[in-house]
Amino acid sequence: MLDEKIKEKIIKELLPALEKEAWELSDDMAAHPELGSNEFESSRKIVEMLCRHGIQVEYPYCGLPTAFRAVINPGGKKKAAFLAEYDALPEIGHGCGHCASGMASVLAGLVAQEVRDTLEDVQIDIIGTPDEEWGGGKVLLQRAGAFKDYDFAAMVHMNGVDSAEAKF
């Protein structure tokens, strides 16, 4: 459990320091949308960002050329994952918001990297899940074993209203 000082640091220092970089990349992906299984520039730019922040990245991942897995606090007894989508739709680009949704997961991972010493025995991974609109990227990753051994996984998805839901 994070203590109040760490929570305050996240809200007052880390998020403001990291969000500009994350949202600039989201805007870049929105301006240069890539369809499923062709997210080569988007995935490369996300991976480069993660590496700049000292995060270990496996790329490509599980046989998918635009999938990746970034590992924060490796070796933890518990494993959690943030899933990041980044594919676009034909003609309307990022109308579904994957550029922003994916970057919200990446931003959560960047914050986790900054407070990794407080994570105790929890490994946090960011898993890039390509081709979500048409090809079922998460299904392909699951079949390749990408999600085995996780205790928890979550993702963000854009919505037209302010809401928070847990889907089980």
Question: Model-predicted segments: where are they?
Answer:
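Histidine/acidic-residue-rich, glycine-tolerant segments that coordinate divalent metal ions
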Residues: T66-R69, D87-G95, C99-A100, L119-F168
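Acidic/His- and Gly-rich active-site-bordering loop/insert found
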Residues: L2-D125
